[in-house]
Each structure stands twice: as structure tokens, then as C-alpha cells.
A protein has these predicted regions:
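Gly/Pro-enriched, hydrophobic low-complexity segments
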Residues: 1-62, 136-137
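Hydrophobic beta-strand residues in large extracellular and virion-surface proteins
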Residues: 2, 119-121, 155-157
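Short, gly/Ser/Thr-rich active-site loops of penicillin-recognizing serine hydrolases
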Residues: 47-78, 177-183
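Short, low-complexity, Pro/Ser/Thr/Gly-rich segments in the mature regions of secreted, periplasmic
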Residues: 166-182
Length: 183
């Protein structure tokens, strides 16, 4: 059982086979212990020996696995926004500006992680008259919070955290002062 110290993250209940040490089930639970999402193995077919292709793969020279910091080097682009609050353990792993495929509009993007959960934060200018004022959606463990602030900036946070946490992160997005460094 992995129990978060704060209520701004989900907890995990891990079910591991005692003999094989394989992960059989993962329950993601909220602060009250209610099931939010579950991943479950339903069938395991153990073989006396590995398949030939697996033996070949095991003998292959493969590149070393990348650490998160190497896969997503620290902020690549300076954005005009920063976060004034993050849940404990989270940090910005990557950030950039790109165009959304669906609208061709530019969006500032930040990828956050605590090593277990990844979150995406999108910030873009929109016409406040045409934008949806606020959206709060949760499907399983994934929350999506999106709102347009008073100056016509749409802020969207997506990830496997409670909706209240996603909302608090979105509300913490602030413009950088001209001479302020990126966090």
C-alpha cells in the first residue's frame, strides 16, 4: 500500500504474486480509500522456459534506459508563465510552445511529474466570448480541469490527480514578470 502524505494525490494498493513477484493488480484510491481506477491482470500463462524470441532479445545489446531527467531535459523553452504551487514532489520536466493540431493555435505546454504520475498543463490565449468558462471532468483517475481566466487565457490541466489538485495547479498559473527567471 502506497499512502500519500497529502490529500492532493491518489494512493495505490498493489497486489503482487508471492511466488513470481509479478504485479497482478493496482488499485488507485482517493483519500477516503474509495476505488478510483483499477488495473487487473486476468490471466497468467507461465511457461517452463522462455520463448526463443525472448532469449534472443535478452542476449541483444540494447541501449541503457533513460532516467526521466535525461528523457525530458530541464525546460527547453522559456515560457511567459510559471506555476506558483505544485503538489509535493512534482517538478516541471519539460516545457515548450507548439501548435495544437486541431486548431493550429499556439499553446504553451508544461509536463510535470513526481516520478509516479505525469501531468500536462496547457496555457493559451482565447476569445473569452467563445470559450467555455470552466470544465471539470474526471474519468477514472484522470482529471481534466479547464477554465478561462479574466484576461482571456485558457488554462487546462490533465492527469491522474484528484480534480481539486488539478484545479489548484491551474489556478496557480501566473504570468512571469519581465525580469523573473523560470522556475
Amino acid at each position: 500500500r502506497l499512502v500519500p502524505k497529502e490529500a492532493d494525490k491518489y494512493g495505490f494498493v498493489l497486489w503482487v504474486d508471492e511466488q513470481s513477484h509479478l504485479l497482478l493488480r493496482v488499485d488507485m484510491v482517493d483519500k477516503e480509500g474509495n476505488l478510483v481506477e483499477q488495473v487487473l491482470g486476468v490471466d497468467l500463462d507461465r511457461q517452463p522456459a522462455p520463448a526463443p524470441w525472448l532469449v534472443t532479445l535478452a542476449r541483444s545489446k540494447l541501449p541503457d534506459a533513460l532516467a526521466l531527467e535525461d528523457a525530458y531535459p530541464a525546460p527547453q523553452q522559456t515560457l511567459s508563465w510559471h506555476l506558483t504551487w505544485l503538489p509535493g514532489g512534482f517538478k516541471v520536466l519539460s516545457q515548450d510552445r507548439h501548435q495544437l493540431v486541431s486548431t493550429s493555435l499556439p499553446v504553451d505546454y508544461m509536463m510535470l511529474s513526481d516520478g509516479v504520475v505525469d501531468l500536462s498543463v496547457y496555457v493559451s490565449r482565447v476569445d473569452p466570448k467563445q470559450a467555455v468558462r470552466q470544465q471539470l471532468i474526471r474519468q477514472g483517475a484522470t482529471s481534466l480541469v479547464s477554465f478561462v481566466n479574466e484576461v482571456g487565457v485558457e488554462i487546462t490541466v490533465v492527469g491522474e490527480v484528484p480534480t481539486e489538485t488539478a484545479k489548484r495547479i491551474a489556478e496557480s498559473v501566473q504570468p512571469l514578470a519581465r525580469n523573473e527567471a523560470v522556475q
